[in-house]
């Protein structure tokens, strides 16, 4: 599975809320030798694939044209809506 991601330029609560209202959500990629990277993902693209076991075995994120193989580490969901608030990915 391959997903497009964009590096976040605005950080903080207000910027995250604006992303969620626009149908996206914040995430972070960390691990390995490289520094952690804050990214933005399209909500519907990710949520539609989360029910498949392959999603949790490893996916490819295309971050500014560079392919990074990652595995979902943590998912923060909304309390009562079927929405993802934030995700953590670890490089593999």
From Swiss-Prot:
The keyword Ribosomal protein applies. It holds the Pfam family Ribosomal_L25p. The keyword RNA-binding applies. GO terms for cellular component: cytosolic large ribosomal subunit. GO terms for molecular function: 5S rRNA binding; structural constituent of ribosome. InterPro entries: Rbsml_bL25/Gln-tRNA_synth_N, Ribosomal_bL25/Gln-tRNA_synth, Ribosomal_bL25_short, Ribosomal_L25_dom, Ribosomal_uL5_bac-type. Keywords: Ribonucleoprotein, Ribosomal protein, RNA-binding, rRNA-binding. GO terms for biological process: translation. Gene3D superfamilies: Ribosomal Protein L25, Chain P. SUPFAM superfamilies: Ribosomal protein L25-like (SSF50715). This is one of the proteins that binds to the 5S RNA in the ribosome where it forms part of the central protuberance. Part of the 50S ribosomal subunit; part of the 5S rRNA/L5/L18/L25 subcomplex. Contacts the 5S rRNA. Binds to the 5S rRNA independently of L5 and L18. Belongs to the bacterial ribosomal protein bL25 family. This is Large ribosomal subunit protein bL25. The gene is rplY.
């Amino acid at each position: 599975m391959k997903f497009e991601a964009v590096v976040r330029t605005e950080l903080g609560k207000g910027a995250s809320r604006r992303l969620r209202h626009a149908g996206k959500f914040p995430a972070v990629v960390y691990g390995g030798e490289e520094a952690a990277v804050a990214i933005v993902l399209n909500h519907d693209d990710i949520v539609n694939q989360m029910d498949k076991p392959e999603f949790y075995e490893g996916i490819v994120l295309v971050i500014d044209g560079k392919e990074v193989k990652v595995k979902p580490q943590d998912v923060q969901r909304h309390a009562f809506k079927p929405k993802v608030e934030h995700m953590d990915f670890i490089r593999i």
